[in-house]
Design a protein with these regions (language model features):
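Helix-rich terminal scaffold detector
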Residues: 1-77, 166-169
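Generic alpha-helical propensity signal that fires on short helical segments
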Residues: 22, 45-47, 52, 118-120, ...
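Short, intrinsically disordered, mixed-charge
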Residues: 43-46, 80, 134-141
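Active-site phosphate-binding and catalytic loops of NTP-dependent enzymes
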Residues: 79-90
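Non-DNA-binding regulatory cores of transcription-related proteins
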Residues: 88-151, 156
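Amphipathic alpha-helical dimerization/oligomerization modules
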Residues: 155, 159-168
C-alpha cells in the first residue's frame, strides 16, 4: 500500500484513554463515603472547568482527558451508590458500616466496615469485600471468627460493635 493513503500521527490528537474500571459488586456506601464521592466529583469538575477556561487549555488536552475520564467514573459511582443508613443496621451483630473492636493474640484493634471506595488500611477502614470483613460479617459480641490472611489465619474475638456517627473517625 502506498504511504500516501496512511494517516501519519500529527501529535495533535491525544491517544484515547481506557476507562477506569468499575466494580461488579454492589456499590454500598456509608453516608460519609457518599459525601466523599460527591465532594471529589465537585472538586474534579471544578478543576476541569478551570482548565477549559484557561488560555492554555489547548496545550493541556491530556490533562483535560484525564479529568473527563475521572468525572465519568465518579458520576457512575455516585449514581450507583447504595447509601446504607447506619442507624437502621442491627446493633447486635456486625453488618456494613459497623465499627468493630476485636481482640487477638496480636492485641486489640478497631475496624470500620465500609464500601470499596472508602477503604483505607491506614485508617482501619476495610472494604466489606475484604477477607477481614467477610470473617466479621454476621458475628456478635463474644463470637470468635477466623481471619484468613496471607500471613496465616488469625483467631479474632469480637468485643464491641458500634454504629455511631462516623464523622469523628
Amino acid at each position: 500500500m502506498s504511504r500516501a493513503f496512511v494517516k501519519e500521527p500529527d501529535g495533535d490528537s491525544p491517544e484515547p484513554l481506557a476507562e477506569l474500571p468499575l466494580s461488579d459488586h454492589p456499590n454500598y456506601v456509608t453516608p460519609r463515603g457518599l459525601a466523599q464521592l460527591r465532594a471529589r466529583w465537585q472538586a474534579t469538575s471544578a478543576r476541569r472547568d478551570a482548565l477549559k477556561a484557561s488560555a492554555d487549555s489547548i496545550g493541556r488536552q491530556d490533562e483535560l482527558a484525564l479529568l473527563e475520564r475521572e468525572l465519568r467514573w465518579l458520576n457512575a459511582r455516585v449514581h450507583s451508590a447504595i447509601e446504607v443508613d447506619l442507624l437502621a443496621q442491627p446493633q447486635d451483630r456486625v453488618t456494613f458500616g459497623a465499627s468493630v473492636t476485636v481482640a487477638s493474640a496480636e492485641g486489640e484493634q478497631r475496624y470500620r466496615i465500609v464500601g470499596e471506595n472508602e477503604a483505607a488500611a491506614e485508617q482501619q477502614r476495610v472494604s466489606y469485600l475484604s477477607p477481614l470483613a467477610r470473617a466479621l460479617l454476621g458475628a456478635h459480641v463474644g463470637d470468635e471468627v477466623i481471619w484468613q490472611r496471607p500471613a496465616g489465619d488469625l483467631a479474632i474475638e469480637v468485643i464491641a460493635i458500634d454504629y455511631a456517627d462516623e464523622t469523628g473517625d
